[in-house]
Structures are given as structure tokens and as C-alpha cells.
């Protein structure tokens, strides 16, 4: 009896956790390893009010820099396409992210191909490390994490959340040390169920929001 009661309580806790306590920021177990250090990241909000993890070197002075070396955004690690998230969608997500983010960053400083003494180096990645199958959660091992909404399991409906994870940093070209780091996740449009293929449009707004935040970021609001 105790075992049965405990199982019921555990299941209830799992449902409550999924229905009301889903984190809006990237949790440590989702860090991809793309950045060398995550320990100094602090929770804050982006220019458009989105929750993010960010670190800015206290001595950072943007007036000391005159250009940014753009390194194309990549997938880290390289994803395996699935029946739900196909290669064409993955390619479109990556290409669009590069286009929008490059344009946004170019509004901050001129982009160059070779670093000078006053250059910043940008590097970024769409990351995906969701492998948890605990409780009522299910994660696809692809950069766009698909999470089963456990609160709808009782009805036979499994609406799928879509999430895009991103990690990026700006590095001082002279010291080769990071001066700004950002880790964030964004929620796209839901899929009807686990059999519904994801379309680029499901995640487009997440990318648009990232680009807007990159354009509007105020370094004085650290």
C-alpha cells in the first residue's frame, strides 16, 4: 500500500512540476559545453524582457572596440534529424539564425574577417543536450528540444512544446578572453502531438526575438 501511495504522490508531483514550474532559463544540465565556463552566469532579462543567463566582464568598455569578427553560428553538437525534426528544417533554422544574428550584430560594430587589436570575436551555437526521460517528460536529442506536455497526457493529447537553445560569447581579440557570455532558451509554437512534424515557422519567432535582443542590448544594464 505504501508503495502504491508513494507512486501516486510522485506522479502527482511530476504533473504539478510540468504544468506550472517549467523553467524559462536554461538549466545547468542543458549546458552543452560550447562555452568554457558557465559558473559566472547570472539570471537576468533581455532587452525585450525575455529571461536569459548572462555574464559581462565588470571592466568591459565597448568604446575600446571598433569591430567584430563574425564566426558563423553552428549546431553544437551536430544534430541527428528525425521524423519530427527533419534535415531541411534544421538547415533552415540554422541559415535563418545566421542571417538575422549577423545583421543584428553588424548594427553594433562593423564586421571584419580579420581581428585587429581593438576587435571583438563573436562565436555562437544552437545547442541541444536534452536527454532526460524522467517522469512525464520526453526529450528529442536534437537542437530543438521537444517536450511532451504531461498535463495533457490524461486526455490522450500530447501537445509538444518546441524550444531553441542558444549559447554565445564575445571574446577580446587582444586577450583571447570572453567579455560577454549569453545562454538562453526560447519557446516556439506548440505542435499538436508527437506525430506532428516541426516546421520552421514553429521556431521562427524565437530567432527573431534573439536578433532583436542582440540589437537592443544595453551593456550598461549588466
Swiss-Prot record:
Residues where lipid is bound covalently (S-diacylglycerol cysteine): 21
Cross-referenced Pfam families: DUF3313
Main localization (coarse): membrane
Signal peptide interval: 1-20
Top-level taxon of the source organism: Bacteria
N-palmitoyl cysteine-type lipidated residues: 21
Transmembrane segments: none
PROSITE patterns: PROKAR_LIPOPROTEIN (PS51257)
Name of protein: Uncharacterized lipoprotein YdcL
Electron transport recorded as keyword: no
Membrane topology: Lipid-anchor
InterPro entries in the record: DUF3313 (IPR021747)
Cell compartments where the protein resides: Cell membrane
GO cellular component terms attached to this protein's record: plasma membrane
This protein's UniProt keywords: Cell membrane, Lipoprotein, Membrane, Palmitate, Signal
